[in-house]
From Swiss-Prot:
<feature type="compositionally biased region" description="Basic and acidic residues">
    <location>
        <begin position="28"/>
        <end position="39"/>
    </location>
</feature>
<protein>
    <recommendedName>
        <fullName>Leu-contryphan-Tx</fullName>
    </recommendedName>
</protein>
<dbReference type="GO" id="GO:0090729">
    <property type="term" value="F:toxin activity"/>
</dbReference>
<dbReference type="InterPro" id="IPR011062">
    <property type="entry name" value="Contryphan_CS"/>
</dbReference>
<feature type="modified residue" description="D-leucine">
    <location>
        <position position="58"/>
    </location>
</feature>
<comment type="function">
    <text>Its target is unknown, but this toxin may modulate voltage-activated calcium channels (Cav) or calcium-dependent potassium channels (KCa).</text>
</comment>
<dbReference type="GO" id="GO:0008200">
    <property type="term" value="F:ion channel inhibitor activity"/>
</dbReference>
<keyword id="KW-0165">Cleavage on pair of basic residues</keyword>
<dbReference type="InterPro" id="IPR004214">
    <property type="entry name" value="Conotoxin"/>
</dbReference>
<keyword id="KW-0208">D-amino acid</keyword>
<dbReference type="Pfam" id="PF02950">
    <property type="entry name" value="Conotoxin"/>
</dbReference>
<feature type="modified residue" description="Cysteine amide">
    <location>
        <position position="62"/>
    </location>
</feature>
<keyword id="KW-0872">Ion channel impairing toxin</keyword>
<keyword id="KW-0964">Secreted</keyword>
<feature type="region of interest" description="Disordered">
    <location>
        <begin position="24"/>
        <end position="45"/>
    </location>
</feature>
<comment type="similarity">
    <text>Belongs to the O2 superfamily. Contryphan family.</text>
</comment>
<keyword id="KW-0027">Amidation</keyword>
Length: 63
């Protein structure tokens, strides 16, 4: 009975390895699939955006 269990486990591992190699389920997503416009200036643009005062109609009271 122990040999049968080991045989079944080895078969399951081999089949899962075959599926991983043949399938494309683990391919990384394309980096340019969704363009990100939330930070077009890069790190320096993000820093300048933090340093820049926020647009506020009542600037002295914006805090």
């Amino acid at each position: 009975m122990g040999k049968l269990t080991i045989l079944v486990l080895v078969a399951a591992v081999l089949l899962s390895a075959q599926v991983m190699v043949q399938g494309d389920g683990d391919q990384p997503a394309d980096r340019k699939a969704v363009p990100r416009e939330d930070n077009p200036g890069g790190a320096s643009g993000k820093l300048m955006d933090v340093l820049r005062p926020k647009k506020c109609v009542l600037y002295p009271w914006c805090g």
